[in-house]
From Swiss-Prot, chains A, B:
Tetramer of two alpha (regulatory) and two beta (catalytic) chains. This is Pyrophosphate--fructose 6-phosphate 1-phosphotransferase subunit alpha. Pathway: Carbohydrate degradation; glycolysis; D-glyceraldehyde 3-phosphate and glycerone phosphate from D-glucose: step 3/4. InterPro entries: PfpB_PPi_PFK (IPR011183), Phosphofructokinase_dom (IPR000023), PKF_sf (IPR035966).
């Protein structure tokens, strides 16, 4: 099997064309001299967790933000790294394949070779298991040739994606030491980057010389916080899904007799569903976050869809397209509670066929109410992160089934007078995950790869490579690095089998912000989407011409560039210092004192633990 | 509802770009003067059915092939049509939406307006039901503006797609008379074109002045015969499906733990599955035609897949991608027989829950053996063409289930030593059907629209618009028209509820020719596909650059241009006549006589009814 990794392969004409595409580097990373500015120490967004995070990360918490600037940038404190001794770096895919992953490795390889041709990049074969077993492939131009700008993770493969147990951490450390690695780059999502931070702390504690760097690559788009604007893979996934969704919309409008229920891969959070809605304008989407916030039951959801179907029928429309995120099922309070009971029993070793009889009365009642196929799926063992096997639970079929039953009832009672309700169900995910990456994902991943090199060259440990201001063209991107521990939060409540992770700092999947601009855009258009069939067909992913440079709608509407604004604030503070120097007038000093007192008062109040709710 | 048809709509950037694309016309159709050559009378490919076809089509059988040539073409007998009195033409979508359908209407509209600005084109709203109810929308440049080169049938919509019963035929005739139509263009597949031929005959018989023209538009690609090389929509469908299949292949190769079972829409025949296999090189495909020819049972198929899984595991490969056409289920002899029994009972009014007890003993045994979900799907009422509801029967889940059971058994017995078998199932169809059409489909459909006009201008009735030599660039395409009745065959055997159609000439779906070049290409590569993972990713549908002008593999490898070769033969015959004129030498005459006697002997033998098996 391993012999197949990284082998050259036959490419289609389009793949060949793409393999010749070369992403642009932002000015700050061009050439071989990069200035590194390390400014203020970072803090966790949720102050209430800070104490715990500090305790878990004594060596790596509170490190400063890093900015990478062009050599000519006029920043007094920045350090120019001019010496580039040869280093050895390892890299691995950790977590589900996301389009663009290969380009991180390509970018890292290019940066390594530009700065010192003697630098060595080793790819671990088969993900974390390859790391533990020290199975490597040296990354060279030849190896990369047929993987540049290509989808999948097949250059190196991936496996179970966990570096968490003592045994796993020790195996990882042994590998880094045996291979004399100066750096270890972990490409993955929320879970893998959490593991990366813990690994970095362990390395710092034990004086292991390998620096650990994380890269935000996940199609779910849920590794989002004040430092991270977007994840590699999300753009492609949403574009491919939107292509398919809008094809289905066109189909619905042509035949006028089907309701399509489409479930979208994306784990617990509904980012993919929201973005696809903004791109393709289906009639409805039900976000897990809405359901959780309004505590909607499965019956509420059914009624809401039935009312929509009925409203459309009154406009003579007997077709429609409804999106459901795969995480929806866990967002429905009573289903979540049922799942927790089931998982608890599974953990106790109760066999699947015995579970029904051991559920609490109310859980048992819900369970027995559900159709046969969905019961079987709810009984599946939970995933390694303690969530249900979301990709295997056909929520779309469950909802379609309940809606159909209700519509037939309404038809019989005469309250619904439209055509007989017909549903067709889909699950979109696997068919998008292996796609050729979009231009944005190619560019973003490639530049992130370069950033990884500069993090290592600066000797930083436990950082994630970050690029901000992404909605602007690549030549305006800001490159930097943030300590992963500063992105962590601590969950204090929980129940069920996941209890073990309570109290341990971790990156948690960012949910859709119901007060954010993307959601606002959806809310404003929801009625129009529902009734007017303003379906939008962005078409298949293009690499040239209109649409090729389009970016995710949610990326473009959100307030962005947190890090740019942090820098702006620092400039203001510097300016105040320059203006209010000893010798300035009484009036100027008075005005400055008054204004600063007011600012500090306001900030103290709104950043006290009691008033903060984590924005992600 | 109707108010929504043909309304201008917001297009995405890519849709806008596409809406400005203008297909090229072959030289023969350029300008306003086209020469029509009507040569030899056509005959049915299967002589044994000829008598019956003649009886059903006394007015429209045996009409000559028509060729459209450029005005300057030196063909002695061709007629130049110079007068173009204003005509009124109706057009409707009939049958499942196929990408490119809109362009037939656009091409027809352009041709009408070029030849006489007073020509009128009426689109029927909502397919055949719009025809019966005489609901029309006049097609204008404004209406077309946002539908050019766009997918779906939403400009006019479509419905049940049948013009067959006396009542339906009479309603159609009434509409044509009331609207004073000179021509009626029916856009559809096998069934709709059969209806078109019968309608043409009826019109001829009753002296209705409306001429009926059919256009081969069906994503299934099964309207294929000596006159028709390809169908509008097939190219797009196969490209979109291949994009998704190859994404799944990349995914399989990255995660290395799943077997993907993908069922493909395409009705009874396996053209879509074959073409997608040739484009994306998955590990396996099981064509319905192979199963039928080898009389494989469902157990044989299971064993065959299990052996493949086992062979791959011996090469350390625990992943794979397997394609199944949706028609497969009907190709399995014992399942087909079971379906016939079920449909018979359903027709007798037996309710679904009672059917199991009334099946014959062997059918009952098979039925009870099948998993619960598939039993429910087999009990669905058959479609209007008497076939099972193929899109609703999850054959891929059935096969995956049976394979999993068998692999677990082998694992237990120790005959299989690979990893635990994991299957993920997909059905690809709806998400491809509404796609933006490929350049080929845009061009092909647009030119077919023009051909329709010339058929009507030449006063032909009961013809299908045909273009041959399609594998070459559009400027080498040959445009013509063939009587639909000449493409018909007569089924003499059959059982079950479909019996009524036995003995009536019809177009039957062309199955994959197991002696054809496309299948040969598959056979040659099958082992390599199975074991070597030579996955090919053509990428998303492009409209520019590499791949944009690619044509279906099966189109390119098949011997083509039947009509071009018919013309070539006529040239040979003409040449013989020129050479062997009275006055030629004894030797020349002797040689000619001997050669011609031999040729006629050979042709008589191989075209006798007993030796002909229909090639489609």
């Amino acid at each position: 099997m391993d012999a197949d990794y990284g082998i050259p392969r036959e490419l289609s004409d389009l793949q060949k064309l793409r393999s010749h595409y070369h992403p642009e580097l932002p000015p700050c990373l061009q050439g071989t001299t990069v200035r590194v500015e390390l400014r203020d120490a970072t803090t966790a967004a949720d102050p209430s967790g800070e104490h715990t995070i500090k305790r878990f990360f004594p060596h790596t918490y509170g490190q400063p933000l890093a900015h990478f600037l062009r050599a000519t940038a006029k920043v007094p404190d920045a350090q120019i790294i001019t010496e580039h001794p040869a280093i050895r770096v390892g890299v691995l895919f950790c977590g589900r394949q996301s389009p663009g992953g290969h380009n991180v490795i390509w970018g890292l390889h290019d940066a390594l070779k530009v700065h010192n041709p003697k630098n060595i990049l080793l790819g671990f074969l088969g993900g974390s298991e390859g790391l533990f077993a020290q199975k490597t492939l040296e990354i060279t131009d030849d190896v990369l040739a047929t993987y540049k700008n290509q989808g999948g993770y097949d250059m190196l493969g991936r496996t179970k994606d966990q570096i968490r147990t003592t045994e796993q951490v020790n195996a990882a450390m042994a590998a880094c030491k045996a291979l004399k690695l100066d750096g270890l780059v972990i490409i993955g999502g929320v879970t893998s980057n959490t593991d990366a931070a813990h690994l970095a702390e362990k390395f710092a504690e034990t004086k292991c010389l390998t620096k650990v760097v994380g890269v935000p690559v996940t199609l779910n788009g849920d590794l989002k916080n004040q430092f991270v604007e977007a994840n590699v893979g999300f753009d492609t996934i949403c574009k491919v899904n939107s292509q398919l969704i809008s094809n289905v919309c066109t189909d619905a409008l042509s035949a006028e007799k089907y309701y399509y229920f489409i479930r979208l891969m994306g784990r617990k959070a509904s980012h993919v569903a929201l973005e696809c809605t903004l791109q393709s304008h289906p009639n409805m989407v039900i976000l897990g976050e809405e359901v959780a916030a309004s505590k909607l039951t499965i019956f509420d959801i059914t009624q809401q869809i039935c009312d929509a179907v009925q409203a459309r029928a009154e406009h003579d429309k007997n077709h429609g397209v409804i999106l459901l995120p795969e995480g929806l099922i866990e967002s429905i309070p009573e289903v979540y509670a049922l799942l927790q009971e089931i998982h608890g029993l599974l953990r106790q070793g109760v066999s699947a066929d015995k579970i029904s009889s051991q559920l609490s009365p109310w859980a048992s009642a819900l369970f027995e109410f559900l159709p046969h196929f969905i019961r079987k799926q709810l009984l599946l063992h939970p995933e390694s992160d303690d969530s249900a096997q979301l990709s295997q639970i056909e929520t779309e079929k469950l909802i379609a089934h309940l809606v159909e039953t209700e519509m037939n009832k309404r038809l019989k009672e005469g309250t619904y007078k439209g055509k007989k309700f017909n549903a067709i169900c889909h699950f979109f995910g696997y068919q998008a995950r292996g796609s050729l990456p979009s231009k944005f994902d190619c560019d973003y991943a490639y530049v992130l790869g370069h950033v990884c090199y500069h993090i290592l060259a600066a000797g930083l440990n436990g950082y994630m490579a970050t690029i901000t201001n992404l909605k602007n063209p690549a030549n305006k991107w800001h490159c930097g690095a943030s300590p992963i521990s500063a992105m962590m939060t601590v969950k204090r409540y929980g129940r069920g089998p996941g209890k073990a992770s309570i109290g341990v700092p971790a990156l948690h999947p960012a949910t859709v912000d119901l007060r954010g601009k993307s959601y606002e855009l959806l809310s404003q258009n929801a009625t129009k989407f529902l009734l007017d069939d303003v379906y939008r067909n962005p078409g298949p992913l293009q690499f040239d011409g209109p649409g090729a440079d389009a970016k995710a709608v949610s990326l473009c509407v959100e307030d962005q560039d947190y890090i740019g604004r942090i820098k702006k604030l620092q400039e203001y503070l510097d300016k105040v210092r320059t203006i209010v120097k000893p010798g300035c007038s009484q009036d100027v000093l008075k005005a400055a004192l008054s204004a600063m007192a007011s600012v500090t008062d306001i900030l103290s109040v709104i950043s006290s633990p009691s008033s903060v709710s984590t924005p992600f």
